[in-house]
């Protein structure tokens, strides 16, 4: 992928983050997401490329912008597949909490798994334990494998888990095994990246989150040499088995079949992201473990962005200063 595109993509997440920031702490996650989506789409359409959204805000009948299959860019130049999550952590943005980021991953045509917006079970580790995880095995066995490979006891292992009611039993199991839990309210994209950074203090991420976030995170994981396995899970197997959830689950299974992917089947990293020629970029909205959040003084705002290129295995942290009046005028905010 053209190196110049990588910088362009970092500008996209910066704009989305700055748009979301206007709704920081205002209690309206939908308004924050809408602002980020509009800014991201506007910036994508300025780029000289022939791109398609493959992971986005939903199907064409569910989302007016950045829907799966939408064409973005000038329509000329390099063929690009794009996975976006304008805000990973909409609730955290609305409530002014930590770890909210804007995310984009890009690769060549057919780089990313095409999957519906549904639940996904994920197990993520860094490069130092690549090749030993197996979602077909019980969690305890995976934890013991990882600890052994790292030369650690289970009591020294740190597992990142989304703090959701569906994970209460998992968190209890990890504690009973003697391992440590780092529970986060949202934002498993940032958590996945953290596991794979060279100076990571987290050994693995495990849990059930969103499939779009899983595919976007897989780009960073592959670029950083980490490992991941995942499994698409119908809604009624995660939430209560109500008639409404069964109906949604049946639709999810049908959509998976149309895309050529099976539910409850283990997907390896190479199934999620098929090529190293990719870019992952994320910009902090609020302060977090991965990135600093936006800081504003009058008309000036500073952002921090991580930019990872798969082919060269480079990790860049970009700190930028933005004149907000000019930017918000362009974005019509």
From Swiss-Prot:
Keyword flag Metal-binding: yes
Reaction equation(s) it catalyzes: beta-D-fructose 1,6-bisphosphate + H2O = beta-D-fructose 6-phosphate + phosphate
Cofactor: Mn(2+)
Binding site for Mn(2+) 1: 33, 57
Record EC number: 3.1.3.11
Pathway stated in the Swiss-Prot or TrEMBL entry: Carbohydrate biosynthesis; gluconeogenesis
Cystine pairings recorded for this chain: none
Signal peptide start-end: none
Keyword list, A-Z: Carbohydrate metabolism, Cytoplasm, Hydrolase, Manganese, Metal-binding
Gene Ontology molecular-function annotations: fructose 1,6-bisphosphate 1-phosphatase activity; metal ion binding
Tree of life domain: Bacteria
InterPro entries found in the cross-reference section: FBPase_class-2/SBPase
Chain positions recorded as Mn(2+) 2 binding sites: 85, 88, 213
A GO CC term assigned to this protein in UniProt: cytoplasm
GO BP, one annotated term: glycerol metabolic process
Binding site for substrate: 88-90, 119, 164-166, 186-188, 210
Cellular location(s): Cytoplasm
Main localization, broad class: cytoplasm
NCBIfam families: glpX (TIGR00330)
Family assignment from sequence similarity: Belongs to the FBPase class 2 family.
Purpose of the protein: Catalyzes the hydrolysis of fructose 1,6-bisphosphate to fructose 6-phosphate.
UniProt name for this protein: Fructose-1,6-bisphosphatase class 2
Lineage: Bacteria, Pseudomonadati, Pseudomonadota, Gammaproteobacteria, Pasteurellales
Gene coding for it: glpX
């Amino acid at each position: 992928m053209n190196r110049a595109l990588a910088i362009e993509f970092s500008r996209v997440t910066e704009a989305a983050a700055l748009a979301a920031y206007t709704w920081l702490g205002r209690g309206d996650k939908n308004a924050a997401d809408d602002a980020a989506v509009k800014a991201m789409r506007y910036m994508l359409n300025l780029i000289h490329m022939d791109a398609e959204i493959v992971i986005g805000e939903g199907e064409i009948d569910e989302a007016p912008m950045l829907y799966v299959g939408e064409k973005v860019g000038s329509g000329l130049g390099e063929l690009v597949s794009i996975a976006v999550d304008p805000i990973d952590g909409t609730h955290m943005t609305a409530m002014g909490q930590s770890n909210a980021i804007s995310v984009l991953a890009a690769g060549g045509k057919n780089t990313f798994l095409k999957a519906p917006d549904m639940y996904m079970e994920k197990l993520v580790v860094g490069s130092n334990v690549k090749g030993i995880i197996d979602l077909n095995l019980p969690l305890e066995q995976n934890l013991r494998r990882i600890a052994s490979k790292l030369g650690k006891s289970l009591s020294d292992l740190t597992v990142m888990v989304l703090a959701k009611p569906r994970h209460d039993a998992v968190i209890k199991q990890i504690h009973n095994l003697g391992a440590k839990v780092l529970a986060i309210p949202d934002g498993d994209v940032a958590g996945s990246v953290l596991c794979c950074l060279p100076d990571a203090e987290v050994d693995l991420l495990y849990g059930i989150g969103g499939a779009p976030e899983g595919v976007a995170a897989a780009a960073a994981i592959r670029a950083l040499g980490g490992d991941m396995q995942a499994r698409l899970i119908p809604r009624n197997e995660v939430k209560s088995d109500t008639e409404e959830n069964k109906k949604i689950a049946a639709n999810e299974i049908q959509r998976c079949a149309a895309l050529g992917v099976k539910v409850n089947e283990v997907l390896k990293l190479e199934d999620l992201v098929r090529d190293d020629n990719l870019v992952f970029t994320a910009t902090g909205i609020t302060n977090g473990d991965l990135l600093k959040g936006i800081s504003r003084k009058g008309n000036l705002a500073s952002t921090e962005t991580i930019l990872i290129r798969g082919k060269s295995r480079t990790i860049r942290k970009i700190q930028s200063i933005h004149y907000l009046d000019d930017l918000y005028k362009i974005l019509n905010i």
